[in-house]
Amino acid sequence: SLSPFLIAKYEVTQAEYAAVMTGHATLSVTPSFFAGDDLPVEQVSLDDLKEPDGFLGRTGLSLPSEAQWEYACRAGSTGPFAGNGLLDDMGWFSENSEVRTHDVGTKQANDFGLHDMHGNVNEWCEDVYSEDFYASELAYGPDPLSTEGFVSRVIRGGYFLANGEDVRSANRESAFPNLRNFSVGFRPVRLPAPLP
């Protein structure tokens, strides 16, 4: 079971990233390989995001756990792809991307109103990658989070060069936390404000 959380409707765009990171002493405000205000920011490592003066520190936001990410992606669906189940309608992948990222929100939203959960760019998650995490009891407790294992971190969603198999709701990948690559961006979460 998951506690309530809020997740961004879109992957963080280059314009949003630049607005938050302006004036940073060492990190680039425009790190992306593909340039465009409404394109997802990429080439931002997990280490960059988590440094004290990084995007997450400056905004007070967090990365989703893998469980939060998959719950948000599926939006109640049980098939391989959310929404109407047709990948071409839901995301950018190898067969329709023209070998590049695309402006966020140009494909259909899933039933939670979230865009680009399939393809465009992979998205960092909070979890340490463990190949057999879902075979453990921890995966089925409240607010599951993998903290044990190798140094690699979970990335989800697939990206614009991935095949259909690799952008499924359930597909899991990993990356070293210092990776800066045009295939990886992020979508933050936060806890809802307490009721008065």
Language-model-derived ranges and their functions:
Residues 37-40, 104, 109, 172-178:
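Active-site rim elements
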Residues 3-5, 112, 153, 186:
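Residue-level detector of short, conserved catalytic/binding motifs and their immediate flanks
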Residues 1-87, 126-134, 190-196:
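Active-site microenvironments of metalloenzymes and redox enzymes
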Residues 77, 97-100, 117-196:
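Surface-exposed recognition segments
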Residues 25, 31, 90, 139-144:
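Proline-centered structural pivot motif
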Residues 19, 115-117:
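Short, well-structured beta-strand-loop connectors
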Residues 89-114:
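A short, contiguous structural element within a folded domain that forms the immediate neighborhood
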Residues 2, 36, 99-101, 109, ...:
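Short coil/loop residues immediately preceding or within conserved phosphate-binding loops
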